[in-house]
């Protein structure tokens, strides 16, 4: 996300008093929903980086390409939140993905994880796969 589902999700989180972290993308499909990032932050939820494009072939072509994608995402977020306060990210495909090997070599994820830490980012994965990256399920 953000997406058309973000406002209803925010309503549920507010009603149930549950804090959340939103791993944000800036793809063309959610361009019109980017102002909702301000609502997410105003509600006290955490904003974290995920990807500007979510196109593995571009993101993982090199470490420079990955950080260019993060820069583009940060620029897309600047009108809505203090991007300097964002210090969490989730790698597209996860930190142990193998799809990145196809584009940036076998060691690209090891290098990116070290670079992320050197840049002051904490990175996170997940422990349950909702299959939302493999099917046409709506984003948050």
Describe each PLM feature range.
Residues 94:
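Flexible loop residues that form catalytic
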Residues 8, 55-81, 97-140:
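Alpha-helical scaffold elements lining the catalytic groove of polysaccharide deacetylases
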Residues 1-91:
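Active-site beta->alpha N-cap acidic-glycine motif
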């Amino acid at each position: 996300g953000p997406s058309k589902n973000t406002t209803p999700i925010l309503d549920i989180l507010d009603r149930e008093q549950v804090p959340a972290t939103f791993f944000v993308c800036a793809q063309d499909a959610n361009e019109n929903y980017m102002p909702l990032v301000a609502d997410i932050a105003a509600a006290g939820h955490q904003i974290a980086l995920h990807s500007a494009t979510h196109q593995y072939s571009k993101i993982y072509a090199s470490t420079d390409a990955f950080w260019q994608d993060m820069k583009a995402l940060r620029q897309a977020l600047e009108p809505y939140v203090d991007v300097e306060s964002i210090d969490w990210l989730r790698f597209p495909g996860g930190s142990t993905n193998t799809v990145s090997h196809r584009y940036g070599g076998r060691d690209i994820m090891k290098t990116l994880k070290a670079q992320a830490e050197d840049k002051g980012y904490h990175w996170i994965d997940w422990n349950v796969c909702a299959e939302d990256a493999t099917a046409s399920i709506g984003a948050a």
